[in-house]
Amino acid sequence: WVERPIGEKKRRKAITRWRSSHQFLAECCKVGQPISRIIAVGASLELLAWRSPFLKKTLRSISHRYYISDTEVNHIAHNLALKSATHVIIPSHWDGSLDGGFIEQAQAKGIKIHRLDGLHGHVHLSPGIHANKVSNPPKVLVRLLKGDGIHDDDEVIEIPELTFDGLEITSANEDQYDGDAWLLDRQLAKHDGVITQSVTLASEAALLGTPTLLISKAKRGFLGRLQDDGYPLFCWNKSCDGDDWKNKLAQFLAGMHLTDAIETEPWPNARNQLAEFLSMQLID
């Protein structure tokens, strides 16, 4: 686990993280078989750790450096990846108009591009059948963001309290969830619906068949993919007021009672495809 270089003194945090990661990798290379590759999901700073932040010293055994991303607007991470990545893995629905020229630059530098047919959720989740019977009142999981992330500070839209009227709410707000945040996806299918400012949680909930209302200005290629594939995702990207907002909320509330009518595209074999990209053998 590494500290995210955000907020005050983020440059110092980044250098400290780079140095500690390099020292860790150097120690690992001294014990047993040297490390030959690094796989970074979104956190491209670790890809720099194959070389020292202060010296010209490099860990030459680390010849394969993979950068995996599904977030086109994470331009800072993309720019760091261009400095060290040898391979980039992005989804087939990647929207190049949002990535700041990242893929074009990666191709120009000779970085190998792999395109995954599916979302990240297709890799670590399993398709399930959502219960048709809705609780009374409906049980809805709500996740609100702090909005201080690298790329989400201008994406957050305030959700009025009236939105939750008549619902039994499970609060899972960022940094305030009482349970294990890494196991939050297991709670999604246990609820009748999800209301969230988080695009990641929205995608996971929709993939599991839970009707989801995403309230965010975020633009991601996978949001269009989910809607095109028939998943129960309702997106709202403006202020929560007016008749259009009331209609969208009504569509979501009605959607919780219509899960038996959901028809989605077949679940892609993204997990095996990713394993092939990484030259890994799955054990289950």
Whereabouts are the PLM-identified features?
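Active-site and donor-binding regions of nucleotide-sugar-utilizing enzymes
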Residues: V2-Q107
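Donor nucleotide-activated moiety binding/catalytic core segment of transferases
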Residues: W18-G32, T170-S203, L207
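A donor-sugar binding/catalytic signature common to diverse glycosyltransferases
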Residues: R37-S61, R65-D70, R186-R225
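A nucleotide-sugar donor-handling region in carbohydrate enzymes
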Residues: H87-D154
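Catalytic binding pocket for nucleotide-activated donors in carbohydrate/polymer assembly enzymes
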Residues: L207-D260
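C-terminal amphipathic helix plus adjacent low-complexity
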Residues: A254-D284
